Amino acid sequence: MSDQNDKKVEIIVFPYHGQGHMNTMLQFAKRIAWKNAKVTIATTLSTTNKMKSKVENAWGTSITLDSIYDDSDESQIKFMDRMARFEAAAASSLSKLLVQKKEEADNKVLLVYDGNLPWALDIAHEHGVRGAAFFPQSCATVATYYSLYQETQGKELETELPAVFPPLELIQRNVPNVFGLKFPEAVVAKNGKEYSPFVLFVLRQCINLEKADLLLFNQFDKLVEPGEVLQWMSKIFNVKTIGPTLPSSYIDKRIKDDVDYGFHAFNLDNNSCINWLNSKPARSVIYIAFGSSVHYSVEQMTEIAEALKSQPNNFLWAVRETEQKKLPEDFVQQTSEKGLMLSWCPQLDVLVHESISCFVTHCGWNSITEALSFGVPMLSVPQFLDQPVDAHFVEQVWGAGITVKRSEDGLVTRDEIVRCLEVLNNGEKAEEIKANVARWKVLAKEALDEGGSSDKHIDEIIEWVSSF
């Protein structure tokens, strides 16, 4: 534990129940608890059952879990119906929890809610509790979402986004059938323009954003400062960076026994993956992972497979079993000498491994954060929403990788993938990128070290709550 004086404060952490959301907010909870504030994680019954014994055995009463929603019978419920049901039931339970914690902590309570659950802020304010929106996306993405949300409402921004930002239209391209959902092509917003209904659903997180008492981002100051992103956001909101929210053993090593995220929705095959990497030379393996929500066509999977087959490097590909069925016949057998394909693997352990040369990623924010923190160059293959925005920053602002160019029909061809891998692994550009990511690795650790920007911001949050 930190040597900071005990504070009689209660931080209620309320994540959305996806793995990426849960992991980052749990790491934030650990940092808060390590500094001797009390944390309650309000989550679903299934998540509580998975995590409760492990978390509470490690943290005692510093971190407790409170189940506020029974999701045990949801397997056959459609996504939108499930979200509506979750909001209705969890809202009532969250309200009761806030009342209870206010009494126990003498009003020194803060609700840290997932930015994708904006209704939680309204409930907090109804009970006189301050609310901090915690975003699983980058600061640049939320700035873009906010700007686009204002546009859909027919409002103009007082200050335009800095020039470094890509056009707002970028996040509306290539919106796929996410999680197998099908959306109508377009709906009309208040400003009379047509938008993807999935985009409008995502933009709901901005509906009461200006009322939030604090905005928290899984980044660090040095990463947000280029392009004046932090400066622009700070003109509108109270913003603090508190990242990277990684297990301490992988970065600053200040928190004893903090060795993993603590929540996994998948069964991870650690041994075969790491043993295979151990057998490979340093910087000889391309790691490919596109997250849990990306679904590619058979044609696109074939292009990726043929690119990996024709390029000379070893590769490790984490690809879900449903996606493996789209691969060319005998691909695994034909590439067995240089490739390993698993349905999932321990990404933190993979990215810190000395055999990894680069990371082919869909540009989910957690993946980018991990790659930057571990100094791994990236080949960005973004699809939709925040991914193109973050890919733009990876290449154009942070100099940490390159982005594939798509054909006119949206396909990433095998030749393009091979070309990008060659640029990323060999030559002057590769050396420039390696130097940049090495710098970001150092800065990420410095942010969490004692007195670093994120470390200080977490202290300031606790002091702020103790002043209520």
From Swiss-Prot:
GO terms for biological process: glycosylation; saponin biosynthetic process; triterpenoid biosynthetic process. The active site is at H21 (proton acceptor), D114 (charge relay). Pfam families: UDPGT (PF00201). CDD domains: GT1_Gtf-like. Its EC number is 2.4.1.-. Soapwort saponins possess anticancer properties and are also being explored as enhancers for endosomal escape in targeted tumor therapies. They may also serve as precursors for vaccine adjuvants. UDP-alpha-D-glucose binds at G20, S292, W344, Q347, H362, W365, N366, S367, E370, D386, Q387. Mainly expressed in flowers, flower buds and young leaves, and, to a lesser extent, in old leaves, stems and roots. GO terms for molecular function: quercetin 3-O-glucosyltransferase activity; quercetin 7-O-glucosyltransferase activity; UDP-glycosyltransferase activity. Signal peptide: none annotated. InterPro entries: UDP_glucos_trans, UDP_glycos_trans_CS. It is an enzyme of class 2 (transferase). Pathway: Secondary metabolite biosynthesis; terpenoid biosynthesis. Keywords: Glycosyltransferase, Transferase. Component of the oleanane-type triterpene saponins (e.g. saponarioside A and saponarioside B) biosynthetic pathway, leading to the production of natural products with detergent properties used as traditional sources of soap. Belongs to the UDP-glycosyltransferase family. This is UDP-glucosyl transferase 74CD1. It comes from Saponaria officinalis (Common soapwort).
